[in-house]
Amino acid sequence: VYVLRAFEDADVPGPTDPLEHLRIVELELTLADLETVEAQIERKRKQSKLDKSLAEEVKALDAVHEALADGTPVYRSGVKAADRETIKPYFLLTNKPVLAVVNVDEDQLERVDEVVAPVEKELGELAPVFGACVQLEAEAALLDPEERTEMLDAFGLGEGALPRFVRAAYNALGLRTFFTTGEKESRAWTFRAGAKAPECAGVIHTDFQRGFIRAEVIHWDEL
């Protein structure tokens, strides 16, 4: 999650342009990833001479190293999806899904779309972006539910940033939710987007997946 500053505060040093902040964050993460790859790549090249199964991993590291050395985060690069998958065990910071939160102040809430727009344009389809006044959200979180709702409504914040953040993070990670319900409880379950009914059943219990017969589709209001 990139938390990008847009709020004005003379007591807090640093840029207040979220686009500039984005570039600083990306540069720092890219340099950290470059250091990680350079610490591994020569060792893997030597090992691949004795173990041919490492050839694909070395190829992937070379592709990623080229992008990082050029100052390009992996998620912005043209590195193939297969190569990005191969290097996952290295836990590179710029090879992860990205969610950008532009931290605005109270005075910017009425024009938050305008403040967020340059970051949305820069990231395009690469990452979801939304604005939030983190200071207000933190203050609201300390209140009881009724007072919190009143405060958020007073500032026109609706449900607040947290539910939007959770939904955006779920989508960025390729996660979805299904529900089970019965007389004793209703429960939410997390599954990977694109999973089929048997795989979702397996999330509840592996026996359900092994013994899966069929799924019936009915309208929600018939439940």
Model-assigned labels for residue ranges:
Residues 2-30:
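Conserved P-loop NTPase nucleotide-binding/switch module
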Residues 17, 25-29, 33, 49, ...:
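Short, well-structured alpha-helical patches and their helix-loop capping segments
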Residues 8, 13, 31, 35-38, ...:
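Hydrophobic alpha-helical hairpins/lids featuring a short glycine-rich hinge
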Residues 39, 43-223:
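C-terminal-of-GTPase-core extension/linker across diverse P-loop GTPases
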